[in-house]
């Protein structure tokens, strides 16, 4: 399912006393404390209904889309920059949202999707596709923010690797790691040869298909 727009309702809590105690009280009311910052404006402490936020968090696209926060009737265009979850139960405990300004570049981590895994010659030869990243930090203006980056691995042979610089980027998008002075063009996926265990397993299967000779069978019966 593709979502083109996310909108959440929020309440301004800036006039209230802030702190751990206040956050606990909000959570007891099924509200998630959060903050909006950036864009040259003052931070705003807010709260969001937990069921609204949880519903949006079900979609991967929520983490790489421009979001609309409706705070007491005033709309704020934001991206989510941090989300704290309960360590055991996983529900959201606090969220940080950064304002986006039209034409002003933002840094975002977007998901990476790998396609063509089954079609890859390396996979068909028994190789193992090892993916080393789940997301990549990019820089772009808000209107050019991609939902995800797709990496086509359908042509990978055993021993092949794919680096950051090999990614075909949408227009206006750059990779943060490659835009730094000490650019690190790291590997993000490689096709490894079959493991020793897998090779041995194949050998065992092949051996089990070979019938025992009469001589070997007689020897076992006689105990010789």
UniProtKB/Swiss-Prot annotation:
Q: Which UniProt keywords apply?
A: Ribonucleoprotein, Ribosomal protein, RNA-binding, rRNA-binding
Any GO molecular function: structural constituent of ribosome
Cellular component GO terms held in the UniProt record: cytosolic large ribosomal subunit
Would the keyword Lipoprotein be found if you checked this record's keyword annotation? no
A Pfam entry, by short name: Ribosomal_TL5_C
Keyword flag Secreted: no
Q: Its Gene Ontology biological processes? A: translation
Per the database entry, which stretches of residues form a coiled coil? none
Assembly with partners or alone: Part of the 50S ribosomal subunit; part of the 5S rRNA/L5/L18/L25 subcomplex. Contacts the 5S rRNA. Binds to the 5S rRNA independently of L5 and L18.
What is this protein's function?
Answer: This is one of the proteins that binds to the 5S RNA in the ribosome where it forms part of the central protuberance.
Family listed? Belongs to the bacterial ribosomal protein bL25 family. CTC subfamily.
Q: What is this protein called?
A: Large ribosomal subunit protein bL25
